Amino acid sequence: MTIALGKFTKDEKDLFDIMDDWLRRDRFVFVGWSGLLLFPCAYFALGGWFTGTTFVTSWYTHGLASSYLEGCNFLTAAVSTPANSLAHSLLLLWGPKAQGDFTRWCQLGGLWAFVALHGAFALIGFMLRQFELARSVQLRPYNAIAFSGPIAVFVSVFLIYPLGQSGWFFAPSFGVAAIFRFILFFQGFHNWTLNPFHMMGVAGVLGAALLCAIHGATVENTLFEDGDGANTFRAFNPTQAEETYSMVTANRFWSQIFGVAFSNKRWLHFFMLFVPVTGLWMSALGVVGLALNLRAYDFVSQEIRAAEDPEFETFYTKNILLNEGIRAWMAAQDQPHENLIFPEEVLPRGNAL
């Protein structure tokens, strides 16, 4: 019996092959199968955000002006979260809340749900785009893995946190000043800066910035001067076989500065990937914990002593009082429908008052 080995070839292309060629090969800018998710979702998310910040008020959900039409600027305009009474409703345009009325849908905060969900899928589509293109040109998938960090932060902050709370109302609104207010809310209600996951996130992001600065400066310091423009892009070309900078010289320099240095480019660049991505993932895990109302570090002994001794106060106890002030102010301001009224004696004051 004879067995013929060879590559199977089809005589004619089926619909899948035609679509595959159209999406991945027959164009200058790569679209890909991931583009079927990325481009529509990104278009709708950005379009919804521009529409909301330009025209839509937050009067009915937050009692605020939030659009350019009402006098806001780029820093104060926002697409605001739905009202607290709407809980976790998806706020579909054709759903029982809006009943197909576009104006009512906007007034209820439907654009926020629209932007958040389409934005999440757009980010996932962008990560899949990196996977798909890397596979097409036979690259490893570390770009996509790195981009999982921002996706984890977005999903945890905008989706998982409000799902753990009483409604979408407690998610951040999509705007600059709105995000700042959400950060203050996180500090006041969760003592976020004293959360170990936040500390790891800060270490990751700032550590990555430090690594990038050191790496860029070191490469610039150790360039081979083998052209008439060694300090510009003119001296080198993308296909050169030679190294652009001297790793040996860089290693000797940092060995003298710190006593230790990276001796391997692969380990160096993996570390530059590992630090920020791990920091972002730790932050995302911390926000998931906040969704479940897990607490940060508590130094109760200091709080008890500060309450008993008027002369004893630490930066920690001062921050706890500050958090109480944030809660007392924001609870009444952000939830006017609750009619929260705090008498003077419950408002926080330091030992100095």
UniProtKB/Swiss-Prot annotation:
Which Enzyme Commission number(s) are listed? 1.10.3.9
Major subcellular site:
plastid
Which enzyme class, named as a word?
Answer: oxidoreductase
Name the source's superkingdom.
Answer: Eukaryota
A molecular function annotated in GO for this UniProt entry is: electron transporter, transferring electrons within the cyclic electron transport pathway of photosynthesis activity
- Identify residues that carry N-acetylthreonine: T2
Q: Which GO terms describe its cellular component?
A: chloroplast thylakoid membrane; photosystem II
Q: Name one GO biological process term.
A: photosynthetic electron transport in photosystem II
Question: Which CDD domains does the entry link to?
Answer: Photosystem-II_D2
* Parts of the chain that traverse the membrane: 41-61, 125-141, 153-166, 208-228, 279-295
Subcellular locations according to the entry: Plastid, Chloroplast thylakoid membrane
Q: Give the residues the record marks as binding a plastoquinone.
A: H215, F262
HAMAP family cross-referenced by the UniProt entry: PSII_PsbD_D2
Entry's PANTHER family? PHOTOSYSTEM II D2 PROTEIN, PHOTOSYSTEM II PROTEIN D1
Q: Which family does it belong to?
A: Belongs to the reaction center PufL/M/PsbA/D family.
The protein's job, in short, is: Photosystem II (PSII) is a light-driven water:plastoquinone oxidoreductase that uses light energy to abstract electrons from H(2)O, generating O(2) and a proton gradient subsequently used for ATP formation. It consists of a core antenna complex that captures photons, and an electron transfer chain that converts photonic excitation into a charge separation. The D1/D2 (PsbA/PsbD) reaction center heterodimer binds P680, the primary electron donor of PSII as well as several subsequent electron acceptors. D2 is needed for assembly of a stable PSII complex.
- Give the multimer and partner information: PSII is composed of 1 copy each of membrane proteins PsbA, PsbB, PsbC, PsbD, PsbE, PsbF, PsbH, PsbI, PsbJ, PsbK, PsbL, PsbM, PsbT, PsbX, PsbY, PsbZ, Psb30/Ycf12, at least 3 peripheral proteins of the oxygen-evolving complex and a large number of cofactors. It forms dimeric complexes.
Q: What is this protein called?
A: Photosystem II D2 protein
**Gene name for this UniProt entry:** psbD
